[in-house]
A protein has these predicted regions:
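N-terminal "mature-domain start" segment
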Residues: 21-112
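Short, well-ordered beta-strand elements
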Residues: 122-126, 197, 201-210
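Surface-exposed amphipathic alpha-helical segments
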Residues: 210-234
Length: 234
């Protein structure tokens, strides 16, 4: 979605909060051999909302209590701006039409959670495909795209806000999850972690932003994804 860059543009930059990531009990820790890729029954579009985290879980992971739900989506939001490099838009932002167009996805559900000032922001999305094979195909294509975009500077030009440029770091894959960090240029340390995986017939695609995210981004993205994956039907 495109809410993250808009919120970041208006945020008042603050110092990084060290060690603010917590672990949800029962969720595999990042870096282990266990990942979310165990295959269960397919998830229907009507079930997607059930696997998203509630606001309390998001607050716990992000180490705050001030975040609330800004909006939820049951459609892929259309791009209301332009990218300097559309082929890398999917590496910077999660669940954007520029990345999913032509993929054959069937349904999507996502929610934006923020503290209102942009200090902490999470966009969690789940996208259903017709089969597990289709979901894994999209995951593999995304992984290839992210690797090709390493080091690139991607500017998003929103219709009603100032342009924001992001620099893409090298992705890391562990436990079935691929995650990268994108740094906001001239953002005083503000960065977003972007993580993606596939479980059953669903792609889990999340973004988490805050100051200091560069140091902990892979862990944050993986923790959110594992928590979502843990809510899938067995």
């Amino acid at each position: 979605m495109l809410a993250a860059p808009v919120i970041c543009a208006s945020a008042v930059w603050v110092a990084a909060v060290a060690g603010c990531v917590s672990t949800i009990p029962g969720v595999p820790r990042v870096g282990g051999d266990r990942g979310p890729l165990s295959w269960g029954p397919d998830v229907a579009g009507a079930q997607l909302a059930d696997v998203l985290l509630d606001v309390a879980q998001v607050n716990q992971i992000m180490g705050t209590s001030a975040m609330t739900v800004l909006r939820t989506y049951d459609q892929m939001p259309g791009d209301d701006g332009t990218y300097s490099d559309p082929t890398c838009a999917g590496a910077v932002f999660n669940t954007v039409e520029a990345a999913y167009k032509g993929s054959g996805y069937l349904a999507t559900r996502s929610s934006d959670v923020s503290d209102g000032g942009g200090k902490h922001y999470v966009d969690q999305g789940v996208v259903a495909f017709g089969s597990g094979a289709d979901a894994r195909k999209f995951l593999a294509a995304s992984q290839d795209s992210w690797r090709r975009c390493v080091g690139k500077h991607v500017t998003y030009n929103a219709k009603n806000d100032s342009p924001i440029t992001w620099t893409i770091r090298a992705p890391v894959t562990a436990g079935g999850i691929t995650a990268t960090v994108v740094d906001q240029e001239a953002g005083d340390g503000y960065a977003c972690a972007h993580g993606i995986t596939a479980k059953s017939n669903v792609v889990i695609d999340v973004s988490a932003c805050s100051n200091g995210m560069a140091e902990k981004g892979v862990t944050v993205a993986s923790t959110i994804i594992n928590a979502i994956a843990g809510k899938f039907p067995a």
